[in-house]
Amino acid sequence: YCIDMFDKWKKSYGKNIRTYLEIVGEIEALISLASITYVRDDYTFAKVNECNDLKPEIDFKNLKHPLIKIGDAVGNGITLKGQTCVITGSNMSGKTTFLRSIGINLVLSYAGGPALASEFKTSVMKVLTSIRVEDNVNKGISTFYAELLRIKDMTEYNKNKMPMICLIDEI
């Protein structure tokens, strides 16, 4: 009986199953983006501008990582206009968390989601990262070599003369 019912359903609706699954996937993605606004109240929506002169801009105030509890997260700010910035500090001072906060909030904003910041302005740019790179024993790639390959990809992308931000942690 169940097999017959499934066959009838498949004949009637089976050709549309891909469309149905894509719609469900899109709804789930939108719910995921919206859920941040339900659980957190320290967010804003980004002001995103086109980058016309290859000098991308970022201006964040009180930027936080969305996966760190509200009471534990430390907000930081940064303003860059087409510059290079090297972030230094002692071990366990939050450098990696800050880089991750920048990257994840940029990606969330570009997807139309909220950013965990009191103010968030950015240009449209490609987000490239070399954070927590791992080796690949099967391919004979050490961690150091994997990092070099990521940075090589970044320099190759730079040849396109397109706006980008490179977030590199510990070479």
Regions found by a protein language model. Give the residues of each.
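Short coil/turn segments at secondary-structure boundaries
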Residues: D4-D7, V39-Y43, F120-K121
